[in-house]
């Protein structure tokens, strides 16, 4: 098992009148090579789960194992050696004031004791161009352009490439197409699928786009109020349709008095 969340308890505003229990003995497991699409309504626990995995947040109880090793107390920075993350906001994964080349060199030097200039040589520059060619956006010809001048789609594509530059073992995609226009969103998913397939990297993708959840990945998980209410893979995942997911969402809504 690559990732194993065991008996997680997560409470917000603990000990106050606003105390809210999200996870109460939550279990979640991911095998190596899985591409898991995670869906669910707002407040279902999707992003909190990602934050716990990456180390951006901590649970009150439970364990997080990565390849059998307990990483529950491991700081976020150290987890970044083997976990890459792309956020919803295209601005979050790159530095606007630096060029494309400088952003990639900075990522290339992550966890190393070298200056920025160490990575900027002809060999590395050619390597960066080759990585950017996969985006099919012409970014390989704009290495000296400031990232702040790129479109949202271009910047998110760069963030995805950067997240995959080092030897990460788990890729976290946190609604990484949500802030993009429809065309850029489709381009981003094409690039995402291509990069994941090429590397065979284990991936968790949180999305509100049900079609993307159905069309991409080999496993689909639906969350609701801190619980997994649907978990399918294999032939079930291949046969899944958007309408099936909508029906489950509606059943949940009816149970909570919000059905139509």
Where are these regions (language model features)?
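Conserved ABC transporter NBD signature motif
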Residues: 62-70, 230
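A short, flexible loop at the N-terminus of ABC-type nucleotide-binding domains that lies
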Residues: 2, 11-25, 75
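Helix-to-loop junction immediately C-terminal to a conserved catalytic motif
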Residues: 54
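ABC ATPase NBD coupling module
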Residues: 70-84, 89-92, 114-117, 121, ...
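Conserved beta-strand-loop-alpha-helix hinge in the C-terminal portion
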Residues: 227-251
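H-loop/switch region of ABC-family ATPase nucleotide-binding domains
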Residues: 207-208
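The feature captures the beta-strand-to-loop junction immediately N-terminal to the Walker
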Residues: 39-41
């Amino acid at each position: 098992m690559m990732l194993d969340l065991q008996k997680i308890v997560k409470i917000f505003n603990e000990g106050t009148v606003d105390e809210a229990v999200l996870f109460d003995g939550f279990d979640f497991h991911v095998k190596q090579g899985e591409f898991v699409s995670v869906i669910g309504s707002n407040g279902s626990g999707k992003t909190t789960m990602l934050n716990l995995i990456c180390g951006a947040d901590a649970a009150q109880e439970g364990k997080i194992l990565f390849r059998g090793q307990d990483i529950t107390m491991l700081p976020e920075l150290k987890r970044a050696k083997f976990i890459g993350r792309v956020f919803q906001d295209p601005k979050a994964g790159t530095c606007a004031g630096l060029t494309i080349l400088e952003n990639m060199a900075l990522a290339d030097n992550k966890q190393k004791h070298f200056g920025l200039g160490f990575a900027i040589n002809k060999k590395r520059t050619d390597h960066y161009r080759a990585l950017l060619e996969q985006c099919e956006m012409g970014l390989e010809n704009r290495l000296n352009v400031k990232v702040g001048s790129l479109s949202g789609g271009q910047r998110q594509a760069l963030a995805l490439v950067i997240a995959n530059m080092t030897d990460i073992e788990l890729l976290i995609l946190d609604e990484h197409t949500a802030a993009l226009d429809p065309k850029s969103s489709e381009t981003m998913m094409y690039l995402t699928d291509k990069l994941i397939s090429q590397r065979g990297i284990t991936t968790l993708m949180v999305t509100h786009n049900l079609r993307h959840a159905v069309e991409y990945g080999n496993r689909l998980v639906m969350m609701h109020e801190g619980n997994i209410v649907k978990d399918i893979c294999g032939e079930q995942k291949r046969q899944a349709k958007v309408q099936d997911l909508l029906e489950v969402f509606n059943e949940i809504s009816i149970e909570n008095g919000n059905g139509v």
